[in-house]
């Protein structure tokens, strides 16, 4: 059972596509948003195998961003994969997609079945320990369209995933995303909510996060 700290949201449980008997979905009824959580979209053994393959086969890179005229390293390793032409601009950098690996294609296909959405690209983030994190942001780039579906798979160590409403400071969520989980955000969520993976001083292992999306092909 996942402990969910909710403010301004309600959690409903419903059956998911019968890929696994344990693949139960929880609807997060967000104010001005939609989200659904599968805490066990992938069985532990399968999730560990996928984690190992991605850790080994993906060409991880540590990127730099320009902040107030200074170049600083992003506190995580990243990679971008997808269909030909699925390039994507984020953090001021234009990313050209690497081809789908067998593990990525396998995860993508499972996510598409569970979510009912189609995806042509994925952003991967490798959080090496608690010193790696992701600041507050929304996935609202023009390439994603007006109301994008963002499907986030977590493999490895459990990390906190935080959301807060852009205007209503009293509306917040704090979700621990476990190994093999899937969180799908849709509707107007990216217009009204920001999300982050905060750093932590607690000892924590490596985590691979994959955010699948449908981008406009160039």
Pin down the residues of each PLM region:
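Non-heme Fe(II) oxygenase metal-center motifs and adjacent flexible, charged/small-residue loops
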Residues: 2-218
